[in-house]
C-alpha cells in the first residue's frame, strides 16, 4: 500500500485474540508525519451471530474491546473503526453459508449484540439515564461446557458494580485501570468473586481462611477439573478435604441440575444505585415491541419507522435462544414493509412501517406463541401543501 492522501488509512485485521490488538503504526505507514487511521478491524476475524452461545458472543465483545484499547494506547493513531455496525446480506461466496455476514455489533435490524455495549459504554455519563449496564452472562450453568459457568463481564460506564446473591452482598467491583483494557475510558469489569464473605457468615471460617477457600471455589467455578497448583497447595495447607470443598461448591457456586440462585447486579454512579440487572431462571416470556419513530410525516414522499422486537424474561433480560415466530398486523394509514410473520433470531427481530398517503392513528399488533399479545401506536401526520412546496 502507499500514501495517497493526507491521512494514511489502514485496514488492520492482525488481531486474532492474542497479543497486541493492532500493528505498530511505525511498521505500517511509510510516513510518520502524516495522520494515521485504522479504517477497519474485527469483521471476519471474529463474526458472531446474535444466537451464538454465550462464550462466543462474549469473545466477540472482548475482541472489539482489545483492539480499541490498543489503538487508544498507541500514540499517533487518530481512531479505529470496527467492522462493522450491522450484519449485512452478501453474495454466496461470503458469509456463513446463508448469504449473511455476521460481522456487525448489531443484527440486520440494528438490534444490539453484546459487543455493541463495548462502544455504548465508552460515553461518560452526565445523568443516570446515560449509564450503560450490560451483564454478559445469563448465569445459566447449562450454557457452558461441563456446567462450569465461565467468565462474567459487565460492560458499563458506571463507577462500580455491586453483586448480590439472593439477599447477601457478595462484593463491589471497579474497573481495572492497570489491566488488559486500561486505556479505554471505561474498561469492562470482570466479575471474579461469587462467594464474598459468605463463608465467614455461614460456615464460621475466620478472616484468614475464608478468602483462601473462596479463591478456590471461584477458580472451580471456571473449571473445577483443572485447579491451579496454588489452589491445590491451599487445600493442603488448610487441610481442606474434597468432601467439604464439594459441599461448599454445591452450596455457594452451584451445579447443573441443582438449586438455582438469584443474582442482582447494581450499577453505582455518584455513590448511588442507578441501574439494576437481575439474573435468575426464566419464569415468564414477554414480547417487547419498540417503534423508534412513532410520529411519521407523509408527503411529498412516504415516511418510515423502524420497529424492534425482543423476547425478554420477567426481569427484562433478552432471551437469546428464543426463536419463536411473531405475527404482525396493522390498523390505520401504515403498511408493513416485509413479511407479516418474522422469526426471532437471537431473541430479536424487526420490521418497518411505511405511510400510505393518509393521516391518522396507526397501530401495530404483534402476536407470539407463549407470550401476551402486544401493540404499539403511531401517529401519521400529513405535510401541508406549503411545506411540500418548500
Language-model regions, residue ranges each:
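Substrate-binding/catalytic cleft of secreted carbohydrate-active enzymes
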Residues: 1-115, 122, 128-145, 176
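Catalytic cores of secreted or luminal carbohydrate-active enzymes
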Residues: 84, 89, 94-288, 317-319
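Low-complexity "stalk/linker" and mucin-like segments enriched in Ser/Thr/Pro/Ala/Gly
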Residues: 180-191, 331-348
Amino acid at each position: 500500500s502507499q500514501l495517497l492522501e493526507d491521512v494514511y488509512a489502514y485496514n488492520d485485521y492482525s488481531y486474532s485474540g492474542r497479543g497486541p490488538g493492532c500493528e505498530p503504526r511505525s511498521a505500517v505507514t511509510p510516513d510518520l508525519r502524516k495522520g494515521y487511521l485504522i479504517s477497519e478491524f474485527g469483521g471476519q476475524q471474529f463474526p458472531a451471530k446474535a444466537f451464538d452461545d454465550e462464550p462466543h458472543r462474549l469473545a466477540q465483545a472482548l475482541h472489539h474491546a482489545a483492539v480499541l484499547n490498543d489503538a487508544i494506547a498507541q500514540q499517533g493513531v487518530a481512531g479505529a473503526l470496527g467492522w462493522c455496525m450491522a450484519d449485512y446480506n452478501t453474495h454466496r461466496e461470503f458469509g456463513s453459508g446463508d448469504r449473511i455476514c455476521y460481522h456487525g455489533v448489531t443484527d440486520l435490524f440494528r438490534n444490539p449484540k453484546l459487543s455493541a455495549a463495548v462502544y455504548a459504554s465508552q460515553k461518560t455519563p452526565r445523568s443516570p439515564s446515560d449509564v450503560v449496564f450490560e451483564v454478559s452472562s445469563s448465569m445459566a450453568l447449562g450454557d457452558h461446557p461441563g456446567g462450569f459457568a465461565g467468565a462474567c463481564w459487565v460492560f458499563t460506564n458506571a463507577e462500580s458494580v455491586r453483586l448480590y446473591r439472593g439477599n447477601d452482598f457478595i462484593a463491589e467491583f471497579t474497573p481495572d485501570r492497570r489491566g488488559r483494557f486500561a486505556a479505554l475510558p471505561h474498561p469492562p469489569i470482570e466479575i471474579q468473586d461469587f462467594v464474598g464473605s459468605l463463608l465467614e457468615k455461614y460456615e464460621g471460617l475466620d478472616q484468614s481462611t475464608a478468602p483462601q477457600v473462596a479463591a478456590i471455589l471461584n477458580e472451580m467455578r471456571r473449571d473445577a477439573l483443572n485447579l491451579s497448583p496454588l489452589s491445590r497447595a491451599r487445600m493442603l495447607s488448610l487441610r481442606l478435604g474434597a468432601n467439604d470443598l464439594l459441599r461448599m461448591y454445591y452450596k455457594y457456586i452451584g451445579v447443573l441440575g441443582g438449586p438455582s440462585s438469584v443474582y442482582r447486579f447494581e450499577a453505582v454512579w455518584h455513590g448511588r444505585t442507578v441501574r439494576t440487572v437481575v439474573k435468575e431462571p426464566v419464569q415468564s416470556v414477554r414480547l417487547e415491541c419498540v417503534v423508534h419513530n412513532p410520529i411519521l410525516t407523509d408527503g411529498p414522499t412516504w415516511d418510515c419507522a423502524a420497529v424492534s422486537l425482543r423476547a425478554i424474561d420477567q426481569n427484562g433480560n433478552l432471551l437469546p435462544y428464543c426463536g419463536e415466530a411473531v405475527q404482525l398486523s396493522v390498523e390505520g394509514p401504515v403498511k408493513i414493509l416485509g413479511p407479516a410473520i418474522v422469526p426471532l433470531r437471537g431473541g430479536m427481530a424487526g420490521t418497518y412501517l411505511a405511510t400510505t398517503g393518509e393521516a391518522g392513528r396507526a397501530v401495530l399488533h404483534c402476536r407470539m406463541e407463549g407470550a401476551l399479545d402486544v401493540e404499539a401506536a403511531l401517529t401519521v401526520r400529513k405535510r401541508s401543501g406549503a411545506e411540500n412546496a418548500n
